[in-house]
């Protein structure tokens, strides 16, 4: 609600809850999003919340990452190895199961696509092999059974996103993007971006 209000009605400023300058001077405020509202006003479908436990045993939030959270693939891989090596710990301590994460992510992406869409196509958009989280991008795309693409693999034609394939262009219905906002679309944001998709925003 906060982000949608900031980019649309701006009631939080009109009601003097917080000063405009606090938001508008932030390096993360994107003036290009002014007047924009995503489907269901869901500005963040996925968030990475880092928790720590203090000496009293309380859980505290160390960091919120709403832009491009990463690390889930390492946690999933680590959990698989730990379950194989120390199965008794999982039984004794009733460790929560997390292996359904790729399925839940897949379903989250499906929810972003209109129900009437037949045979929807989805993909994971990666900055490329040089990115530190490339392993995760590849891991998630494989686990979900969807394409892993780079910006050069996509193009926009008449406001529709297409993927280049050996059989020609393929309409893309949902993208799980793993690159920062500013690099997403060189027409809308950082003009020098070589990893984004012109016209995607």
What is each PLM-predicted segment?
Residues 1-201:
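Domain-scale recognition of functional cores that engage charged ligands
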């Amino acid at each position: 609600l906060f982000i949608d209000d900031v980019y649309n009605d701006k009631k939080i400023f009109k009601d003097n809850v917080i000063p405009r300058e606090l938001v508008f001077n932030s390096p993360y405020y994107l003036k290009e999003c002014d007047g924009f509202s995503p489907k269901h006003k869901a500005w963040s479908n996925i968030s990475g919340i880092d928790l720590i436990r203090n000496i009293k045993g309380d859980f505290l939030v160390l960091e919120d990452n709403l832009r491009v959270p990463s690390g889930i693939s390492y946690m999933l891989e680590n959990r698989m190895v730990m379950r194989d090596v120390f199965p008794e710990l999982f039984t004794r301590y009733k460790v929560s199961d997390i292996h359904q994460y790729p399925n839940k992510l897949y379903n989250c992406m499906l929810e972003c696509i209109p129900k009437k869409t037949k045979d929807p196509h989805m993909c994971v958009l990666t900055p490329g092999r040089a990115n530190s989280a490339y392993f995760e991008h590849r891991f998630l795309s494989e686990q979900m059974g969807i394409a892993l693409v780079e910006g050069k693999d996509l193009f926009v034609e008449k406001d529709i996103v297409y993927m280049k394939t050996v059989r020609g262009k393929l309409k893309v219905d949902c993208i799980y993007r793993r690159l920062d906002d500013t690099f997403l679309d060189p027409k809308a944001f950082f003009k020098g971006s070589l990893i984004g998709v012109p016209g995607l925003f």
